[in-house]
Amino acid sequence: MGQKKNLEAAQLAAEFLANEVPVAAICGATAGLARAGLLDKVLHTSNSKDYIAQTGYQGAPFYRVSPTVRAGGLITAPATNSLEFAREIFSCLGVYSDEVLAGWYNLFNTGDARYFAD
């Protein structure tokens, strides 16, 4: 049942990307995209190069060691960078202005309440 659901999710992600609908994957979700071939020809990141290589995917030349990678409508991140991942999603979707997004990120990154007013 789990593998079937993963395949369905990957197929939906492929449809979204083909229709220019953003897709975001963090931690193990990047492995699901890799298994489906969705990371074979696009810049991406994951938990580590060795982690994602276990999927047998062909995208190693496109792997980047980075807190997040945004390639068109595809956003990927390792498990350790959930804050940066959220910031990239908000940026992609245009949820906040650049100024408000910077304040939001700084508040959660530092815990300094002065950024709340920004």
PLM segments and residue spans:
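Active-site-adjacent pocket-lining segments in enzyme domains
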Residues: 1-118
